[in-house]
Amino acid sequence: MSTIELNHLTFTYPERSFSLDVEDKHFADPMVAIVGQNGAGKSTLFKLLTGLLTPQTGVIKIDGENFNDLKPVEKLLKVGITFQNPDDQLFNPTVQREVEWSVAQVMDDHDTITRRALAALKRVGLDDKTA
């Protein structure tokens, strides 16, 4: 089971007065619910946990490793995110190309990327959506 530690974590958006200040939180349960009102910082927290945003202060540790020190590919192997609104997530014209883009973040052989993307789509029943 993985553990997530958040120590004195802060992030402030420049365009608005918002601050997420998390102090010494440890999550080791198999399932944790993050709840709060709109604008409370749930999405910001997950963007910090996936490396889409970088905290101004504090440390994120996953399984004892400082997440901020990991390379982008190492972060991708530890944490993933699916956005509520797919328009915020998908950039490629087809499902296959979107999955290939994700695979290409951890390898560079084109044939292997295509093969792995198609296998992933087949596993989730989307292999008919490749065009």
Label every model-predicted segment:
Residues 87, 93-105, 114:
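Short helical segment in ABC ATPase nucleotide-binding domains corresponding to the A-loop/adjacent helical element
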Residues 33, 73, 77-84, 93, ...:
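ABC nucleotide-binding domain signature
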Residues 58-68, 75:
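Conserved ABC transporter NBD signature motif
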Residues 50:
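Helix-to-loop junction immediately C-terminal to a conserved catalytic motif
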Residues 43-44:
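Conserved Walker
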Residues 111-129:
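Conserved ABC ATPase "signature" region
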Residues 35-37:
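The feature captures the beta-strand-to-loop junction immediately N-terminal to the Walker
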